[in-house]
A protein has these predicted regions:
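Extended alpha-helical, oligomerization-prone segments that build pores/tubes and scaffolds
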Residues: 1-175
């Protein structure tokens, strides 16, 4: 893990540092198309939005990851076709009290040179027209399927909709 995932140890160390301060932390492991390998990232609890009634992330109807991304990184992903090539402006919102307190405790200060864009990566179940779940009788079942929908927090523009299940899986389980 640490030989291939160069970010694993620093991300894990950062997660362990934040754990006593926040009470909860998360790891996001996913395949990165640009690096062409699995990646493991630390996600602070304040960057994960989960319904109050959810008992776990696996069965939650929606989970939203608040992603801070630089204009340059977003542009790279747009040029590569990962996100739609549309204009998205940097977020104008001030950091939350939680973020300011965590930054102060950890000795980090925000960099105002590179404007960050806030994206909302929503892991949701949807019944999309033209992509419905089809039953044995060939008719749509009305069952919602798992997707990852990414939008800009600043203006609500849609950047991507990606299937979050294997096309070979008849049960359409979340990846």
């Amino acid at each position: 893990i640490t030989c291939v995932m160069k970010e694993y140890t620093p991300e894990f160390d950062q997660m362990l540092f934040y754990l006593p301060l926040s009470g909860s932390t998360f790891k996001k492991v996913y395949y990165d198309e640009f690096l062409e390998r699995a990646v493991s990232k630390f996600v602070p609890a304040e960057q994960l939005i989960v319904p109050y009634t959810a008992t776990d992330l696996e069965t939650a109807e929606n989970v939203t990851h608040v992603i801070q991304i630089s204009e340059n990184e977003l542009r790279k992903k747009q040029v590569a076709g990962f996100y739609l090539d549309i204009e998205v402006s940097a977020s104008q919102s001030d950091p939350s009290e939680i973020r300011e307190e965590m930054d102060e405790i950890s000795g980090v200060s925000p960099n105002h040179l590179d404007q960050e864009i806030t994206l909302l990566e929503c892991h949701v179940d949807l019944d999309l027209e033209g992509y419905e779940d089809i039953g044995d009788n060939g008719e749509p079942t009305g069952i919602k399927l798992p997707y990852v929908v990414t939008i800009s927090e600043n203006n609500g523009k849609l950047l991507s909709i990606r299937r979050n299940y294997s096309p070979d899986d008849p049960g359409h389980k979340k990846n």
